[in-house]
A protein has these predicted regions:
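A residue-level marker of the well-folded mature domains of exported/periplasmic proteins
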Residues: 1-204
């Protein structure tokens, strides 16, 4: 049977690379891979997965937009006897066959400790968060706050939905309210790059 790959978004270079890697491997193995882009819309992802199930796929690879919202559709796939692999983000409450992800809590904790070493304890810091409900957002936020709540002055936490353009806008707004900001922790590279554009030549 075919392999279905439901990806959270193809508007982010990381996930583009992820899907290209899957496509290259599928071609090498002679497997039929169907890639569907949820466009960061949890409801669309649910219908995408239900559609893949109706196409009688044998394997579902899922990269959730929202780790809770995707669960019922993934449970339907499991019930239909489809093997399920989650990638980069988890599916909450569903016993999938394989979960492939990095330790986002530990990664964020280490990054925040490094930031403290650069800007010093008690420095004013902002957090730019990922898409609400994504396990990566929750875990990276947890890792950041494990250190930041003890060692930094977190003056703003706002979401920019893992988007570069939103990261820039959010950062501009934060800087207007907090001109003496010393650091910013972003939940992904794209938002960080947007924040860098907003910061310009300021010493942050």
């Amino acid at each position: 049977g075919s392999i279905g790959f439901s990806v959270s978004t193809l508007n982010n270079p990381f996930f583009v690379t992820l899907s290209e890697g899957a496509e290259a491997k599928a071609e090498e193995e002679g497997a039929d891979l169907i890639v569907v882009d949820a466009g960061d819309d949890a409801a669309k992802q649910t219908s995408d997965i239900e559609d893949l199930i109706s196409r009688n796929i044998s394997v579902l690879i899922v990269n959730p937009v929202d780790s809770d919202a995707v669960a019922p559709a993934v449970q339907d796939a499991v019930a239909a006897g489809i093997k399920v692999i989650s990638v980069d983000r988890v599916v909450n409450g569903v016993d999938v066959d394989c979960a492939i992800a990095s330790d986002n809590v530990e990664g964020a904790r280490m990054a925040t400790e490094y930031m403290v070493s650069l800007i010093g304890e008690g420095a004013k810091t902002a957090e730019i968060q990922g898409t609400s409900g994504a396990s990566a957002t929750i875990d990276r936020g947890e890792g950041f706050h494990l250190v930041a709540d003890e060692q930094l002055d977190v003056v703003s936490s706002q979401t920019a939905n893992f988007s570069r353009s939103e990261g820039m806008t959010v950062m501009e707004n934060i800087l207007q309210a907090q001109p003496d900001l010393k650091g910013v922790f972003a939940h992904n590279d794209e938002m960080a790059l947007g924040a860098v554009e907003a910061i310009g030549n300021r010493d942050i």
